[in-house]
């Protein structure tokens, strides 16, 4: 099991933000995290990444408790790309991706063949070979997202956390990015708003509402008109496409 979470709870200013969150994700599985605005998706992502302390939780990566991993070792096992990742304007794509090797290097270490191989592999995974020398301020929104995901991949993590990476991208780039993400050889936990994207590309879904998990399972086993009505307060029809995926239409 790549990542397991048991009874995760978060309190901020004495208020329960997340309560009793539990789920598991297998190696190389893509897990979609869904829920309305304010349901706790970003808080859960940031807690898993170690940026917000949990009031209680057992979080393990490949059986190793996160609480026992030093920060540098944690960054070798888990990578996080937040919603609004940024970079210095004059850094090139290759410079940014190379920053992903920081957890594997100490000050004044020489750049190694292993570092180069990890960076090149990450660049190829996100199809950035033709953009290596382009600076950050010249990249489109989709190119910036791919660049930051490549940086995270250069960490060589077991688990990759992506907080709404397709927001503000047009449909073409949403689909392109989701195809690249789901082809990665790592476990991906990805926060999404689009139910159709989640149903098409994720093997498992976790539905959050008011800081609690209300459903978890494969898209075709949990996405129902009743669940959508209860969670997002909209009516929906669900059909199966000729490709075997779900198509959700809103009334």
Language-model regions: role of each:
Residues 34-36:
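The feature captures the beta-strand-to-loop junction immediately N-terminal to the Walker
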Residues 49:
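Helix-to-loop junction immediately C-terminal to a conserved catalytic motif
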Residues 57-65, 74, 134:
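Conserved ABC transporter NBD signature motif
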Residues 98, 113-131:
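Conserved ABC ATPase "signature" region
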Residues 154-158:
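A short, proline-enriched helix->beta-strand linker immediately N-terminal to the Walker B motif
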Residues 160-164, 169:
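Catalytic Walker B motif of ABC-type/P-loop ATPase nucleotide-binding domains
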Residues 230-251:
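ABC ATPase nucleotide-binding domains
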